[in-house]
């Protein structure tokens, strides 16, 4: 009886001492918002390496997606006056994805809304409601059909169109970062209002990630 009890206690001890995934959270500011990446690995260093790798990937994407940075592809493209511009692979992929979303939604999503964004002063200290005549004038330059994807990372904007990828930027960055994962890591990424959950949730027996939506 004592041997059985001892074996049982040993089994309980071994179960309790089983290695649990270790987590590491990287908090940082990018793309004009706060972001957080929590990664889990076999030890804290592995988790930290994963989180830092994803953070670096996201930071590297900012020049590809920003339209306000003068050193960015979008800034050059928006100020090219209809000339063909060569952009990075990341920028081209983001524009290509934006065009696909525009086509899928029949234009309900449109990445050429930059003239209207500027007109309304969104994300500035001069936000206001413009006159209808101003809106109509800006709309004359809006339309995803004004984007020409010419291949080999070559892009041209027609009819005075300008790109604003803010509508998909953080989601695109989430997917691009997730593409680096090899399937062994578990990651919860919060990029502004965009959330990506990958692998198994080590904090739940089911391994599932639970998402709640307030006031859907």
Listing of model-derived features with the role each one plays in the protein:
Residues 4-216:
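Mature catalytic core of soluble alpha/beta enzymes
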């Amino acid at each position: 009886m004592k041997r059985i009890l001892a074996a049982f206690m040993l089994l309980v001890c071994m179960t309790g001492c089983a290695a649990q995934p270790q987590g590491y959270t990287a908090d940082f500011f990018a793309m004009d918002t706060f972001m957080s990446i929590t990664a889990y690995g076999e030890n804290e260093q592995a988790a930290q390496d994963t989180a830092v790798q994803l953070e670096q990937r996201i930071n590297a994407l900012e020049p590809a997606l920003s339209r306000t940075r003068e050193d960015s592809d979008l800034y050059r493209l928006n100020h090219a006056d209809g000339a063909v511009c060569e952009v990075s692979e990341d920028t081209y992929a983001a524009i290509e994805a934006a065009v696909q979303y525009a086509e899928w939604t029949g234009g309900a999503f449109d990445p050429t809304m930059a003239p209207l964004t500027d007109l309304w002063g969104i994300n500035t200290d001069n936000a206001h409601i413009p006159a209808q005549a101003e809106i109509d004038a800006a709309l004359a330059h809006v339309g995803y059909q004004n984007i020409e994807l010419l291949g080999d990372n070559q892009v041209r904007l027609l009819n005075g169109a300008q790109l604003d990828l803010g509508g998909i930027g953080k989601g695109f960055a989430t997917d691009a970062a997730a593409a680096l994962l090899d399937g062994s890591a578990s990651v919860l990424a919060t990029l502004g209002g965009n959330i990506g959950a990958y692998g198994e949730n080590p904090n739940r027996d089911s391994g599932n990630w639970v998402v709640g939506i307030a006031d859907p």
